[in-house]
Amino acid sequence: RWTHENYSVLKYYDLDKDRIKTVAPRQRYLAPSIDKNGQIAAVSRSTIAGKNQLVLVNLENGKELRSFDVPENAFIKELTFGADDKITAIAVTDTGITLFQFDPSSGMWKELLQTTSVNITSPIWKDGKIYFESGANGTNNIYCFNPADNQVYRLTNARFGAFDPSFSRSDHRLFFADYQANGYRIASLPADSLLF
């Protein structure tokens, strides 16, 4: 069976030098997210022994800094760093999909959302809130989880689906892919007009 062993390789594209650099060859890293300083990658890893982990990798030399077992041995499918260096993980458990927050300084995990059977994807942090896409109401829309009140708010009301949220640099507009009968189009809304 080891004849078919394979790896996932952590790489990045250097725009200034116009080349691809391999950071960590022959690993089992998935779903990389880069910290605000561009020095550390948080990645998901499934070990040969079947443990699911969050791993912090030094992007300068590819060395593993630390690894942490995921609660309930959940599989992390997406990661994102917040402004406070805490990491949000969308994870698949035996009972569904959940949203975890991880604090690298303490090594503590916190479950932010109860496990659900609907898909959650494309997480981003903005102003202390987590924005993501989900089909919770039957159609994919953009949602926001506010840790201050532990509530989830639907922000868009797309007819066929809203995907891949992102904020403009000025922070005044939410951009997303709006699915239409003739394909995807880029849409945006002023932040103060969202369905909060």
Feature map (PLM): residue ranges:
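A short beta-strand motif characteristic of beta-propeller blades
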Residues: 18-24, 63-69, 108-114, 151-156
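A flexible loop/linker signature enriched in serine peptidases of the S9 family
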Residues: 1-10, 24-29, 43-55, 69-75, ...
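Residue-level detector of Asp-centered blade-edge/turn motifs that repeat once per structural unit
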Residues: 36-37, 82-84, 125-127, 169-170
